[in-house]
């Protein structure tokens, strides 16, 4: 689950971290009122969407008049913002953040993720603030400094100081950075975060550090104990198909291809997508129906896949371990008949009662192709959408 910038900064405030004075707004008049409350003669107004690249897309602007605030609000509220991180439709802008301006002398980067290899929260810091950290990692990886947090003892002040030295900070900046580092580490653990990013973390002309931006992702598996955060989730930013899938405990991620994929098991699903690519096709989605591939779940999976107008064929790849393939075949047939599938459906079954499952599919009389192997299934799917 992702948070908006204004929500992330509210958490920063709660943990004692320095952020600009800012107010979230729903209307143009609220934006003007917010500027009056903040004071000053210049403000930054930002579209609130779950995507990066807002500045380059026109979703962040420095304004010096109240009319400028109104104009920006009227331009974006109720519209969709398209950035390099969104699809062609973009994401809806329902809120704006009006903030005071900061006198920036230098921009830094500070973020944290869970490193699966070391099984520890890892902080990353760089002098290259204000740009995509992925680009820095690719072009100048030596400019990224890391600190791994031992889960037994937690983040230590010396780790913050060490990062501060590597960033070239001095004087009171070192103490400020260490406080931010320790606060973020506590926030990361207590709120079950999976990603945290401040880009940029700025040094002002007065030698103060301020969290100028904030990005937070929360582990969706921890929502049962993060109910307050779950309550502020902005579902308008989520893909409708992904929300539908979550209701049925299906793991679905929309992509931009033409071959819908339905698979049981995340690893098998990724392998299926790879082999579709290998044979010249493009998957329209990642969909893992899990171990309980019942008729009801398969039916909902078909509905989700076919709600994408780009889907020209559906590839079903099921390994029958706990679940028998003949029952899966019955479920696929029932789902195809109920949903009224009009595109070709290619089914590859392997494992428990696979031969019986393929026989049931072949005798169904529906537009279902029983593939002999995964390679055959991928070739049939690519052929069905007009590929070679």
UniProtKB/Swiss-Prot annotation:
It catalyses: succinate + ATP + CoA = succinyl-CoA + ADP + phosphate; GTP + succinate + CoA = succinyl-CoA + GDP + phosphate. The keyword Transcription regulation does not apply. Substrate binds at residues 264, 321-323. Mg(2+) binds at residues 199, 213. One of its GO terms (cellular component) is succinate-CoA ligase complex. ATP binds at residues 46, 53-55, 99, 102, 107. Keywords: ATP-binding, Ligase, Magnesium, Metal-binding, Nucleotide-binding, Tricarboxylic acid cycle. It is an enzyme of class 6 (ligase). Transmembrane segments: none annotated. One of its GO terms (molecular function) is ATP binding. InterPro entries: ATP-grasp, ATP-grasp_succ-CoA_synth-type, ATP_grasp_subdomain_1, Succ-CoA_synthase_bsu_CS, SUCC_ACL_C, Succ_CoA_ligase-like_bsu, Succinyl-CoA_synth-like. Binds 1 Mg(2+) ion per subunit. PROSITE patterns: ATP_GRASP, SUCCINYL_COA_LIG_3. Its cofactor is Mg(2+). GO terms for biological process: succinyl-CoA metabolic process; tricarboxylic acid cycle. Residues 9-244 form the ATP-grasp domain. It holds the Pfam family ATP-grasp_2. It comes from the Bacteria. Its EC number is 6.2.1.5. Pathway: Carbohydrate metabolism; tricarboxylic acid cycle; succinate from succinyl-CoA (ligase route): step 1/1. Succinyl-CoA synthetase functions in the citric acid cycle (TCA), coupling the hydrolysis of succinyl-CoA to the synthesis of either ATP or GTP and thus represents the only step of substrate-level phosphorylation in the TCA. The beta subunit provides nucleotide specificity of the enzyme and binds the substrate succinate, while the binding sites for coenzyme A and phosphate are found in the alpha subunit. Heterotetramer of two alpha and two beta subunits. Belongs to the succinate/malate CoA ligase beta subunit family. This is Succinate--CoA ligase [ADP-forming] subunit beta. It comes from Psychromonas ingrahamii (strain DSM 17664 / CCUG 51855 / 37).
């Amino acid at each position: 689950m992702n948070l908006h910038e204004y929500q992330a900064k509210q958490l920063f405030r709660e943990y004692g971290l320095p952020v600009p004075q800012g107010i979230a707004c729903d209307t143009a008049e609220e934006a003007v009122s917010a500027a009056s409350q903040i004071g000053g003669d210049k403000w930054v107004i930002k579209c609130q969407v779950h995507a990066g690249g807002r500045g380059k897309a026109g979703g962040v602007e420095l304004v010096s008049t109240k009319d400028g605030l109104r104009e920006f609000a009227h331009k974006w509220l109720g519209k969709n913002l398209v950035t390099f991180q969104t699809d062609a439709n973009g994401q809806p802008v329902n809120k704006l953040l009006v903030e005071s301006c900061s006198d920036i002398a230098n921009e830094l980067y500070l973020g944290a993720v869970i490193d699966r290899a070391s099984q520890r929260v890892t902080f990353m810091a760089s002098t290259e603030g204000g740009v995509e950290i992925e680009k820095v990692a690719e072009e100048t990886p030596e400019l990224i400094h890391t600190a791994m947090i031992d889960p037994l003892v937690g983040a230590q002040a010396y780790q913050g100081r060490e990062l501060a030295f590597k960033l070239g900070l001095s004087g009171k900046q070192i103490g400020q950075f260490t406080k931010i580092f320790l606060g973020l580490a506590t926030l990361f653990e207590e709120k079950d975060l999976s990603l945290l990013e401040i880009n940029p973390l700025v040094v002002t002309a007065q030698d103060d550090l301020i969290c100028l931006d904030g990005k937070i992702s929360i582990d969706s598996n921890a929502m049962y104990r993060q109910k307050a955060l779950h309550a502020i989730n902005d579902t308008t930013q989520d893909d409708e198909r992904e929300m539908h899938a979550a209701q049925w405990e299906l793991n679905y991620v929309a992509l931009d291809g033409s071959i819908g994929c339905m698979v049981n098991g995340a690893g098998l699903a990724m392998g299926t997508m790879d082999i579709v690519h290998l044979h010249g096709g493009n998957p329209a989605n990642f969909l893992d129906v899990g171990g309980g591939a019942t008729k009801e779940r398969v039916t909902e999976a078909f509905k989700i896949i076919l709600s994408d107008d780009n889907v020209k064929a559906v590839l079903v790849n099921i390994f029958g371990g706990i679940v028998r393939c003949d029952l899966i075949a019955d479920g696929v047939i029932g789902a195809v008949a109920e949903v009224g599938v009009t595109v070709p459906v290619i089914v590859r079954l392997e494992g428990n009662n696979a031969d019986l499952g393929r026989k049931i599919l072949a005798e169904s009389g529906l537009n279902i192709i029983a593939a002999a192997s995964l390679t055959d299934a991928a070739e049939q799917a690519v052929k069905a959408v007009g590929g070679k």
